[in-house]
Amino acid sequence: MRYYPARRSARSLRSTRSVRFPNDVVFLDHIRQGDLEQVGRFIRARKVTLDTIYLTGMGALHEAVLSGNLECVKLLVKYGADIEQRDENGWTPLHMACSDAHPHIARYLLSLGAQKDVVNTDGEKPCELIDSDCEELVQLFSTKEGD
């Protein structure tokens, strides 16, 4: 005896449900992935606002700094991201660049006038979050202190 499976139409094989994520979730994912084209599209289409503090407790620029992607940071700044925006713990993007050892991003933020003496809710300045092994950041802040 031979088994013949019931024929199913292509329509019944398609999922009847689809998952849709909120724009902010998709936007932050594009930032983390460094997908500059999609990040730009979201901003130009006004699907997101750059001053929002998301469920992660951070803004878009904070997320870009954490990803270590300077080009994404530059793109967000180009579209108006605030380089002094604070996350829920009072950290600025410069705090994050120093804490996560991204000297190229810290240098860029400082070149735009980011405040190096601003303190977070724990009273820490960005330079106090630098790992002493990150010589480039240590040197960057030691030369900036003399300015």
Predicted regions and their residues:
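Ankyrin-repeat-protein effector appendages
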Residues: 1-27, 112, 119-147
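N-terminal segments that cap or nucleate solenoid repeat domains
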Residues: 11-59
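Ankyrin repeat start-site detector
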Residues: 22, 55-56, 88-89, 121-122
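Conserved ankyrin/ankyrin-like repeat signature
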Residues: 38, 71-72, 104-105, 136-137
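Ankyrin repeat domain, specifically the short helix-to-loop turn at the C-terminus of the second helix
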Residues: 43-48, 74-81, 107-114, 142-147
